[in-house]
């Protein structure tokens, strides 16, 4: 008799190989999502989405998948994930009272160790409790109190763009000696503006990014935090396997540096809280959060929750708004008819800087608002999918010919960039066409259809708490610029920075990092002729 000797290593290799084959067969043929088309590798492993996260084109790949596969509105984008590209799916997944909760991956997403802010809290009841508290600091009534601060920041933003030479990039080519400034990277200046606004609103103090470069590193800190989150929402096990140190070591370091700085500011701000309570001082968001009590339980936020929520508010409120603002400059500088129309509207409605307010004059600038909405549609700040897990019983999504049932325990989402470029809701989806948001020009039905698929700030109870502020910041800044300056795209290679290539020419293309990392457009400014 011949005896074969098999080493323990060989046995383990065989077991791992066999288990891998079994898992692959299950995912390809027996998984509840097996019937849905999608990239072959995505059906087998989440490393497919990690690849597109690493290269920052995940939002584009999602759009391409919807256009490539036969069941175009339903695409499998992970072993346990499906994308839905319809307004019915969008509302079924994200609206109030639906049978979904945040995906399990968000358990790894924490801006402060051991604490989950509203953004990453999975439990719906816990989220509702936190949202009630945070909402007290970002109510419309509170935002109205900051009208003057918003206006002053917008006017400072405009004056910085109007300077002949960029104070933070003095080596840029000078203007053409005909009144035009040197090229300005509007992405950078938009970051400075929105971050100053949010830090002032939240902490009652500003990082002064519009006037001093000392704290410009905080922008990189925010982007580092977002880059880290983008990987963890795709594959949360990365941190357990220590792959975060390989895939995004610099992002991780920047994220922690920003968190430490925000804690320092929080402690300094907290020490002044008692003093401010007894003064006739304007109440910032932090003081409101500090004083907020849940109307049902009477509970208030812990110190760590205060840190996490204030961190989140600054990041969410600044990063999303800055993308919308930079995108607005991009599209207006490339669409002369829209630029001329909105410029005329603003200059006719607003006669002094005091008119830049939450009053009837700025509100009457409906085409300005339409330009902002169209820019957010074409280049959404959060272009990927916000994943949700279906609860027991699953989720039913209405379809044109039959309903779709998503089983419980599976993950589902809608790619924001993809649905924003779905011609079912947006005819000529790659064309900058602000008129699509004006009922008097396209009709109520067309506007309602466009609104049904618009998700720049998400929907329902998990929507961005700062969306109302964002829709003020951007028009304030654009109005402040257009009241005093003309602007144009730079006529040099710098003018192409931020623009897509090939079929995406004319599009403001961002790097997907959960939110958006952006560069450009480079714009020149010239003081308005009297």
From Swiss-Prot:
Keywords: Glycoprotein, Heme, Iron, Membrane, Metal-binding, Monooxygenase, Oxidoreductase, Transmembrane, Transmembrane helix. Induction: Expression is positively regulated by the apicidin F cluster-specific transcription factor apf2 that binds to the eight-base-pair motif 5'-TGACGTGA-3' called the 'Api-box' that is found in all promoters of the apicidin F cluster except in the promoter region of apf2 itself. Pathway: Secondary metabolite biosynthesis. GO terms for molecular function: heme binding; iron ion binding; monooxygenase activity; oxidoreductase activity, acting on paired donors, with incorporation or reduction of molecular oxygen. The keyword Oxidoreductase applies. Its cofactor is heme. It is found in: Membrane. Heme binds at residue 464. It comes from the Eukaryota. Glycans are attached at residue 85. It is an enzyme of class 1 (oxidoreductase). The keyword NADP does not apply. Cytochrome P450 monooxygenase; part of the gene cluster that mediates the biosynthesis of the cyclic tetrapeptide apicidin F (APF). The non-ribosomal peptide synthetase apf1 incorporates four different amino acids to produce apicidin F: L-phenylalanine, D-pipecolic acid (D-pip), N-methoxy-L-tryptophan and L-2-aminooctanedioic acid. L-Phenylalanine is the only proteinogenic amino acid directly used by apf1. The 3 other apf1 substrates are non-proteinogenic and have to be modified by other enzymes of the cluster. This is Cytochrome P450 monooxygenase apf7. It comes from Gibberella fujikuroi (strain CBS 195.34 / IMI 58289 / NRRL A-6831) (Bakanae and foot rot disease fungus). The gene is apf7.
